[in-house]
């Protein structure tokens, strides 16, 4: 017999009754029922119940074992009595009567429980991650991660993509976040950078004549952590294609992404035909470029109903600035003063002066609007708003006013809040859509200059003609995002592969041709030698997995994540290094100036 096991802890069934077997694993829990010991033995695959009575030669050792000890058990498979069958376990019809137990490794008193999975302080969980990973839900999440990534690889290979690995040590590149820098020992005063994404390398692969590339790519960005973003590193399904339009990228990747979700959604509905929503429409309708389309609320402009009205707060704003708009946020079934007051209080907690509203109710045979706004704008305007928004008895509508560029995020948050408060969001489905036609440039108010709105390597719609003749802020990019349930899960573009167009695009943000050659020299040189039209995208693997397993944050689907302060509590990183190491790297640490 094998030294440690003949079967795993999930393998035995009623057909194995009478067999002599050997199992090894962790003691999940021990129960004493009238002098008979029951041990739940756990391994990677599952749990099997072990029984030791006082007549068993294994009983003496069984009395000593404690939770999370590692043991080997020899014994006979027996059928459980009818009332003892555990239908929650695949092995629940059998148990092992132990004839021998060997302790392979004892365990100290646990700093956190493995059995039962109660909430526990996250820093303790991360410091003892090797114990945390034994817990059922986290263990299952990590296995789901492995299967989802394997499915991504399989699906990409099936449609003709080839997997390439690109360098981890590369040059620093301004791609929107801070780089992690690696000092060079050989080249004094010089630094490598960990790649924020394989952006330039995958484009170089297209120039090199490879047609379809993909990679499960590690990416490194020194940015502040959020619930939907891990500090330090993350992984993406990175891909690039030659001789394609953006429509062909969508048509290629939509079946892949839909298939991944369907395979792991556990029966939840998945969007069959992904909508394509222009960025400007997404902002005006949902207040976000990553809208949760499970929320049925759609905003509309109602500026005309307030212009010249008796509601002077909005009317005066409209009169003083033609760019001012009023947006309406409909709230089906939200027509109670209590709900409207809660929304108003929430708006104030978000730093807003309030959230104006109208709600409608039947007065006899007549449907009337109520609230301060209805009183001030009058019955005719109130009815016009109700008709435009398609509202009825028991519904409400909230209003925000000002410059859309200033208030759209708050309006989107109000839409989200109303949808959640009124239980309008169907949480048991995955709603995917493409957001397209992103702006190419944006105005950087802090530095009073033009900047790229998204990927600087995107092709502007209209090419050189647009760069030379259009208002920069009106130029759109061949840039697109894939969104799901309020998260951006992928981003991509058709690339700017023409050297003269590339230089002109960077000139608009204050970078000269020399700057372009210095910062993106490899890519710029490559484009001098015949670059095919190409494009691609990158899907955030961590976010996709988080959505599919229903985790509350990314640390719940990652093996060894850092905490919210970007500290690895298990490995104690970042850490001090020796003076000799610093000397080899030509680094001298200056005292930290305390403010």
UniProtKB/Swiss-Prot annotation:
The record marks 33 as: Important for tRNA non-discrimination. L-aspartate binds at residues 175, 221, 454, 495. Its EC number is 6.1.1.23. Signal peptide: none annotated. GO terms for cellular component: cytoplasm. Residues 199-202 are annotated as: Aspartate. It is found in: Cytoplasm. It is an enzyme of class 6 (ligase). GO terms for biological process: aspartyl-tRNA aminoacylation. One of its GO terms (molecular function) is aspartate-tRNA(Asn) ligase activity. It holds the Pfam family tRNA-synt_2. InterPro entries: Aa-tRNA-synt_II, aa-tRNA-synth_II, aa-tRNA-synth_II/BPL/LPL, Asp-tRNA-ligase_1, Asp-tRNA-ligase_1_N, Asp/Asn-tRNA-synth_IIb, AspRS_core, GAD-like_sf. Keywords: Aminoacyl-tRNA synthetase, ATP-binding, Cytoplasm, Ligase, Nucleotide-binding, Protein biosynthesis. It catalyses: tRNA(Asx) + L-aspartate + ATP = L-aspartyl-tRNA(Asx) + AMP + diphosphate. ATP binds at residues 221-223, 488, 540-543. HAMAP family: Asp_tRNA_synth_type1. Homodimer. Aspartyl-tRNA synthetase with relaxed tRNA specificity since it is able to aspartylate not only its cognate tRNA(Asp) but also tRNA(Asn). Reaction proceeds in two steps: L-aspartate is first activated by ATP to form Asp-AMP and then transferred to the acceptor end of tRNA(Asp/Asn). Belongs to the class-II aminoacyl-tRNA synthetase family. Type 1 subfamily. This is Aspartate--tRNA(Asp/Asn) ligase. It comes from Brucella anthropi (strain ATCC 49188 / DSM 6882 / CCUG 24695 / JCM 21032 / LMG 3331 / NBRC 15819 / NCTC 12168 / Alc 37).
């Amino acid at each position: 017999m094998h030294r440690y096991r003949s079967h795993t802890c999930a393998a035995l069934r009623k057909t194995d009754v009478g067999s002599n077997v050997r199992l090894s694993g962790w003691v999940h829990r021990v129960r004493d029922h009238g002098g008979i010991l029951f041990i739940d033995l756990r391994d990677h695959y599952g749990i099997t119940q072990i029984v030791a009575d006082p007549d068993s030669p294994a009983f003496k050792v069984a009395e000593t074992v404690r939770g999370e000890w590692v043991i080997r058990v020899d014994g006979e498979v027996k059928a459980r009595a009818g009332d003892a069958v555990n239908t929650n376990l695949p092995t629940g019809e059998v148990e092992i009567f132990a004839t021998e137990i060997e302790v392979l490794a004892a365990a100290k008193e646990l700093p956190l429980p493995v059995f039962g999975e109660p909430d526990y302080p996250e820093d303790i969980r991360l410091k003892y991650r090797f114990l945390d990973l034994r817990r059922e839900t986290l263990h299952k999440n990590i296995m789901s991660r492995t299967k989802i990534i394997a499915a991504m690889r399989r699906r990409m290979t099936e449609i003709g993509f080839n997997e390439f690995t690109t360098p981890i040590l590369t040059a620093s590149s301004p791609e929107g976040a801070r780089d992690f820098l690696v000092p060079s020992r050989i080249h004094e005063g010089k630094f490598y950078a960990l790649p924020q994404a394989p952006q330039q390398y995958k484009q170089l692969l297209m120039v090199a004549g490879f047609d379809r590339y993909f990679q499960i790519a590690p990416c490194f960005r020194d940015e502040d952590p959020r619930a939907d973003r891990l500090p330090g590193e993350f992984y993406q399904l990175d891909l690039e294609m030659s001789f394609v339009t953006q429509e062909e990228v969508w048509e290629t990747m939509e079946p892949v992404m839909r298939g991944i979700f369907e395979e792991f959604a556990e029966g939840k509905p998945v969007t069959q035909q992904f909508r394509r929503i222009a960025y400007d429409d997404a902002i005006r309708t949902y207040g976000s470029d990553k809208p949760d389309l499970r929320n049925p609320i759609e905003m509309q402009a109602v500026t005309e109903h307030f212009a010249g009205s008796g509601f002077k707060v909005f009317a005066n704003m409209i009169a003083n600035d033609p760019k001012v708009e009023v947006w309406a946020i409909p709230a089906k079934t939200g027509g109670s003063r209590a709900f409207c007051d809660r929304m108003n209080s929430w708006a104030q907690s978000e730093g807003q002066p309030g959230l104006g509203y109208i709600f409608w109710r039947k007065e006899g045979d007549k449907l009337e609007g109520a609230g301060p706004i209805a009183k001030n704008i009058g019955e005719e305007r109130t009815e016009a708003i109700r008709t435009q928004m398609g509202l009825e008895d028991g519904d409400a509508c909230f209003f925000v006013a000002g410059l859309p560029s200033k208030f759209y995020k708050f309006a989107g948050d109000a839409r989200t809040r109303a949808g959640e408060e009124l239980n309008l969001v169907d949480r048991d489905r995955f709603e995917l859509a493409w957001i397209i036609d992103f702006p190419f440039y944006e105005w950087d108010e802090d530095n009073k200059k033009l900047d790229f709105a998204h990927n600087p390597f995107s092709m502007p719609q209209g090419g050189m003609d647009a760069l030379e003749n259009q208002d920069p802020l009106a130029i759109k990019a061949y840039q697109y995002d894939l969104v799901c349930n309020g998260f951006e899960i992928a981003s991509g573009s058709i690339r700017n592969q023409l050297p003269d167009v590339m230089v002109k695009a960077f000139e608009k943000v204050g970078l000269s041709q020399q700057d372009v050659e210095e910062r993106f020299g490899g890519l710029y040189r490559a484009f001098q030698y015949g670059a095919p039209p190409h494009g691609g995208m990158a899907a955030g693997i961590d976010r996709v997995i988080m959505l599919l397993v229903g985790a509350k944050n990314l640390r719940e689907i990652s093996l060894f994540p850092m905490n919210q302060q970007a500290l690895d509590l298990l490995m104690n990183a970042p850490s001090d290094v020796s003076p000799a190491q610093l000397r080899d790297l030509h680094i001298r640490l200056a005292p930290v100036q305390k403010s």
